[in-house]
A protein has these predicted regions:
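FAD-binding core/adjacent interface of flavoenzyme oxidoreductases
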Residues: 1-10, 77-158, 232, 243
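FAD-site-proximal beta/loop scaffold in flavoenzymes
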Residues: 126-153, 236-304
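Beta1-alpha1 glycine-rich phosphate/pyrophosphate-binding loop at the start
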Residues: 2-79, 158-159, 167-198
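Helix-biased detector of long, well-ordered alpha-helical tracts
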Residues: 388-742
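A Rossmann-like FAD-binding core segment of flavoenzymes
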Residues: 80-88, 103, 175-271
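A conserved FAD-binding loop/helix module that cradles the flavin
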Residues: 287-337
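C-terminal auxiliary extensions adjacent to catalytic cores
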Residues: 7, 339-392
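FAD-binding beta-loop-beta segment adjacent to the flavin cofactor pocket
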Residues: 265-282, 326, 342-348, 441-443
Length: 742
């Protein structure tokens, strides 16, 4: 999944809009060998905008109306970068991201939607709630709805914008809230739904009246203060909550790009959806405007532009003539009415009824299903790299015979680019490191300390190289923390695939920067490393630490009567395995990543504070495998409470579908040490005891009289899944080391 194939060209997609989801699915079904897709989006889900009113009304759940971008990108072998774009450098073919390294591209496409634009209204920020970006609006709406549902006080809500969006949203709010709250719709036009048939306008004016929604027309908003709308006609309107559903503009980050934009900041494109400024930049949806005609912002255009965009991206890579996009002059518009009623309009015709809503519902759900119900079996296998990509460098990389030994080292040019400007935090006890490199690093070890050394490395388990670098650093440092050591230095081990130099250097740099961000926080200095070419990426670290001789936390220090505490939930193995098969929900993957990004440093400090002297980190051998390591040199047995073991969201579901990590079957052989395993071996929770963990939590023995204090302290310090999972007792049978209790 995480690009084992050769990367020659990078297609970068900004935004998970309706056009881009079509492109991503198409490349999953029919990839171009050598082209790597990367989607950058601030959220792991993409709302199908036509279903937004249905969410507000309560007709749809979150999952009903959203496309899972993690499943889609996993299906299509597309990298997913959860991030915020803050700029584009077209001259350097780079996209600048907030809080992480930039990404380079050979072809860039932008389908990230528009922003609300109310520059002419004073004091609007932090008071009014714009509908765009939609995810921010939905979280605000959820908060307000919850407030209203738990209060008897009538609330005064104002919506500004008399177009289809404003009308749909205010009628949906009425349906959701009932009649006890005051709703007002304000438009600067002399009528609502400008451009729609008279009959459609009549239907909705009548509907607003019947549902006690005030309609204020021909009002220009001058200023919005807290609780008051001030108009140019010196007529004020009071409100508790105000929503903006009208004017839009391009995002702020696009304005500093030196690309051709219109007055509202939208990207200007030609009829091939290509930027007027740069031929390797495309755009679609609400973020674009055409240079030769006006096209109103509507989801139907973005959906249909997706097909042309997909064809033109493919043709651009093959240096072929691009297709022209020809928007339809008229299209069917369906506007919902809050309840399960809707109005359909085309030309001068209008139709109203429940059947219209159910028709729209069928269309919308069908669209969502195309991108959420995916099967990897549908994908074509095409390994042949297009001739146009076969530069001298690429041809050389594809030679049958590649050297071993030192002839397989990464080129100096790759290393120089990757190691430039890494911002490594320095320690006083590092004598020679990367700032003054030599044949080896030199490190001071104080007379009263011992040196601890550990090593770990593995292939990527997620597609984002920066996140992968962070997780790998946490995982490698965890062994030191489990011993009670203070990390000191790290040396990188990196096997790099056969890609062009500039692709490799950026990939390596992203991984290193992710790791260094963690190392700097953990007071660990990167002092060197080694790179070699390989079939796929492998990455990790040899880490060293310092420890007092009398403060070593050994696995075998468990005592009779100790309570067993686990600091993190288990389940990363099965969730990551499901993600590789496009079977994991985005929220599950997000939670698993958040868990892996939590350092074990503070948890070990807390464990020591409350008398813990035995601990280990839970990694590849799973909870049972690592617990057995703690027990094997003792005369003790562990009583495990299966119901108390914390489990990551979704892990029970994925493992019950027999989606397991590669090491799972071998780990399950540890069952022979469990006294009563046959009572539980069909339970998904039992299977998770053997799930291999990446950057897992700490398992420790704590004296019984300090358990509650220890758990409270762990919870206060961000270890919210910390639980007591069992007790250690005296062993009666040599073969049995674990007993599971209900």
């Amino acid at each position: 999944m995480f690009y084992k194939k050769q990367v020659i060209k990078d297609l970068l997609l900004i935004g998970g809009g309706h056009s881009h989801i079509k492109v991503i699915k198409s490349f999953g079904m029919n990839p171009i060998p050598g082209v790597r897709l990367t989607l950058i989006n601030p959220d792991m889900y993409s709302l199908y905008s036509g279903m937004l009113p249905g969410i507000i009304s309560g007709h749809y759940s979150f999952d009903d109306a959203h496309i899972d971008l993690i499943k889609l990108t996993s299906y299509s072998n597309c990298r997913f970068i959860k991030g915020k774009v803050i700029g584009i450098q077209p001259g350097d073919n780079r996209v600048i991201l907030e809080g992480r390294p930039p990404l380079s591209y050979d072809l860039l496409s932008i389908n990230s939607g528009s922003s609300s634009n109310y520059k002419e209204i004073e004091d609007i920020d932090n008071i009014a709630i714009p509908v765009k970006p939609i995810n921010n609006f939905l979280s605000q709406w959820k908060y307000i709805k919850n407030k209203i549902d738990n209060s008897k006080k009538e609330r005064n809500i104002v919506v500004i914008g008399g177009g289809a969006g404003g009308v749909e949203i205010i009628t949906a709010m009425r349906h959701s809230l009932g009649e006890k709250n005051s709703l007002t719709l304000i438009t600067k036009e002399n009528k609502i739904l400008s451009g729609f048939p008279k009959k459609t306008i009549h239907y909705f004016e009548d509907h607003l009246k019947k549902n006690k929604i005030k309609l204020i027309k021909e009002i220009e908003i001058k200023k919005i203060t807290k609780g008051k709308v001030i108009s140019t006609k010196e007529k004020d309107f009071l409100f508790d909550d105000i929503f903006l559903v009208a004017q839009t503009a391009g995002p702020q980050w696009l304005k500093g790009s030196n690309l051709s934009l219109n007055d509202e900041g939208f990207l200007l494109v030609n009829d091939k959806l290509q930027s007027l400024s740069k031929e390797n930049i495309f755009g679609s949806g609400d973020i674009i405007d055409f240079d030769n005609y006006n096209l109103k912002k509507a989801g139907v255009y973005a959906v249909r532009q997706g097909d042309v965009l997909n064809k033109n991206i493919r043709k651009y890579f093959q240096n072929k003539i691009l297709h022209k996009y020809k928007p339809q002059k008229n299209f069917l518009s369906i506007i919902t009415m809050g309840s399960k009623n809707a109005v359909a309009s085309k030309y001068s015709l209008s139709f109203k009824g429940k059947w219209v809503w159910y028709w729209k519902n069928y269309i919308d759900k069908n669209f969502i299903a195309k991108f959420n119900n995916l099967s990897i079996k549908d994908m074509k296998i095409n390994e042949r790299i297009p001739k146009i990509f076969l530069t001298k460098e690429v041809k050389k990389l594809n030679e049958d015979i590649r050297c071993g030994g030192c002839g397989a080292k990464a080129a100096r040019e790759i290393l120089n680019l990757a190691l430039d400007d890494l911002n490594i935090k320095k320690r006083d006890d590092i004598v020679i490191g990367l700032d003054n490199p030599d044949d080896a690093s030199i490190i001071k070890i104080p007379n009263d300390k011992l040196s601890t050394i550990s090593l770990d490395f593995f292939p990527p388990m997620i597609s984002d190289p920066y996140l992968f670098g962070q997780i790998t650093a946490h995982h490698c440092l965890s062994d030191l923390y489990a011993m009670g050591a203070e990390p000191q230095s790290a040396m990188a081990i990196s096997c790099l695939p056969l890609w062009p130099k500039h692709k490799l250097s950026e990939e390596l740099k992203s991984m290193l920067l992710g790791s260094i961000q963690v190392f700097n926080n953990e007071n660990t200095q990167l002092v060197g490393g080694h790179t070699s070419e390989a079939e796929q990426c492998i990455y990790g670290f040899s880490v060293t630490g310092l420890i007092n001789k009398d403060k070593i936390l050994s696995k075998s220090n468990l005592k009779k009567g100790d309570a067993l505490i686990l600091t993190k939930a288990i389940g990363t193995g099965t969730i990551l395995a499901a993600n590789m098969r496009a079977k994991a929900n985005a929220s599950w993957v997000d939670n698993a990543i958040e868990s892996m990004l939590v350092s074990n440093r503070m948890s070990v400090d807390i464990i020591k504070k409350y008398g813990g002297i035995a601990c280990t980190d839970i990694t590849g051998f799973g909870l049972i495998g690592h617990l057995l390591e703690m027990l094997e040199r003792t005369q003790l047995i562990a009583n495990l409470n299966l119901e108390n073991i914390p489990i990551l969201d979704g892990a029970d579901e994925t493992i019950s579908k027999k989606i397991i990590s590669t090491l799972q079957d071998n780990n399950e052989k540890f069952s022979r040490y469990i006294k009563n395993y046959s009572e539980f071996n069909k339970s998904p929770n039992y299977k998770l005891l053997f799930d291999p963990q990446t950057a897992g939590g700490i398992l420790a023995g704590i004296p019984e009289d300090h358990v509650d204090e220890c758990l409270n302290d762990l919870t206060k310090n961000n270890y919210t899944n910390a639980r007591r999972i069992g007790t250690v007792e005296e062993q009666t049978n040599k073969e049995e080391k674990i007993y599971i209790i209900k």
